[in-house]
Regions:
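N-terminal "arm"/small-domain region of PLP-dependent enzymes with the aminotransferase-like
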Residues: 1-29, 340
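Conserved PLP-anchoring active-site segment centered on the Schiff-base-forming lysine
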Residues: 66-121, 296-297
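Aromatic/hydrophobic pocket-lining residues that form π-stacking "cages" and hydrophobic walls in ligand
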Residues: 89, 143, 206
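Phosphate-binding glycine-rich loop
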Residues: 27, 36-78, 92-94, 102-104
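Helix C-cap/helix->beta junction micro-motif
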Residues: 96, 149-150, 300
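PLP-dependent aminotransferase class I/II
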Residues: 16, 36-54, 127-131, 140, ...
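Active-site phosphate-binding strand-loop segment of PLP-dependent enzymes
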Residues: 108-189, 196, 338
Length: 366
């Protein structure tokens, strides 16, 4: 069986220098030396200052903290988000004390379109969490204008977008951008989160909330929690950052080969085809039923994944929340499928995967 994904974190030898530094410092959490180094290197990677970056324990909590930090409209308790996302997005909204209101996504970009949100939803909303789908760039300028025009704070769930940020239209600004460091993400620390924002006050509020509401002393100034990123996860993150140029090169080469082969198949679209970013996903959209294609590939020893299933509004945990018709979400749930994609996937395996997809799709092409 060819697995749909195989995480690959830094090897023990690559971690050892950082682990030795932890042993020497005997500082294991609470903004230790590796935490400071990791934050500084991330800031330099994106051309930011240290005061424009904060690290927290995971991206689900990161979204919740960002929502708490951006001064949500207190008269409202409903936060707009796409249904076409991973369950962490609405869970984070609930953690922040809000109720998710699911909106449909644009047919081409697979993300919320600020110009298409319902006026009533906007009037009743405390905020918006828009999502970068599978690591794709987002037009942040458009969303900053939306936030200013409507007086509604916005947070960007960019869990898989480590590489896309700063490319194309995905610029860093006053909207907090939340990036996951989970083992399944392009840059991984096993678990963790990066939050970027050009407003140092928002970053400081997030840092404060993540540390029991403490500021300069151990006196809680605001309600908070414990969401600090420990030194061991920072060690993994630093080692991953050391290897990032090589990792990106491998992902790029594999992506290009996949694209070249998939282009041969009629009736097939590849999400993100031709874009400049890399991610850990290879998502196809077919004219046929994705469930049937998944079964066809499974019979040939190829694992696939409907990464976002049929949308979050279909999950039992979220069915009690306000849901309108979501035709694009429904379409994507039926017609999209995640193919195997990871840094050491062999070309021979890609050939086997694409040949099996072609075998199913070609006879059914319109």
């Amino acid at each position: 069986m060819i697995p749909v994904f195989r995480p690959q974190l830094p090897k023990a030898a690559e971690l050892l220098p950082y682990l030795k530094r932890i042993d020497e410092a005997r500082w294991y959490s609470n903004f230790g030396p590796l935490h400071g180094e990791f934050r500084t290197r991330i800031a330099r990677h994106y051309g930011l200052g240290d005061d424009q970056v904060v690290l927290v324990s995971n991206a689900t909590v990161g979204i919740a903290l960002a929502l708490q930090a951006v001064a949500l409209k207190r008269s409202a308790h409903q936060c707009i988000c796409p249904s076409w996302t991973f369950a962490a997005t609405p869970h984070a909204i609930a953690l922040a004390g809000q109720s998710p209101v699911f909106a449909d996504v644009d047919a081409a970009t697979w993300t919320l379109d600020a110009d298409q949100l319902a006026e009533q939803d906007i009037r009743e909303a405390s905020g918006v969490v828009m999502v970068s789908p599978f690591g794709a760039p987002i037009d942040m300028t458009k969303w900053e204008r939306f936030a200013e025009r409507n007086g509604i704070p916005v947070v960007c769930d960019a869990a898989a977008s480590f590489d896309a940020i700063g490319r194309e239209e995905f610029r860093i600004g006053t909207i907090p951008i939340v990036i996951s460091l989970h083992a399944t993400k392009p840059l991984a620390a096993a678990e963790g989160c990066i939050i970027l924002c050009t407003d140092p006050d928002i970053i400081e509020r997030i840092r404060q909330i993540s540390n029991f509401g403490f500021s300069t002393t151990s006196v809680a100034q605001v309600l908070g929690t414990n969401a600090k990123l420990n030194e061991y996860n920072c060690a993994v993150g630093l080692a991953s950052l050391d290897a990032w140029p090589e990792t990106r090169e491998k992902l790029t080469a594999m992506r290009e080969y996949y694209w070249e082969r998939l282009d041969e198949i009629p009736g097939l679209k590849v999400f993100g085809r031709g874009r400049s970013y890399v991610s850990n996903y290879m998502i196809i959209e077919t004219e046929t039923d994705g469930y049937q294609l998944s079964n066809h590939l499974a019979q040939r020893g190829i694992e696939t994944r409907r990464w976002w299933r049929s949308g979050c509004h279909q999950h039992p945990a979220f069915t009690s929340f306000n849901v309108k018709p979501l035709p694009q979400t429904r379409r994507l749930g039926v017609h999209t499928l995640g193919l195997p994609f990871y840094s050491d996937l062999a070309k021979t395996d890609i050939d086997k995967i694409v040949d099996a997809v072609d075998e199913f799709c070609r006879p059914r092409a319109a």
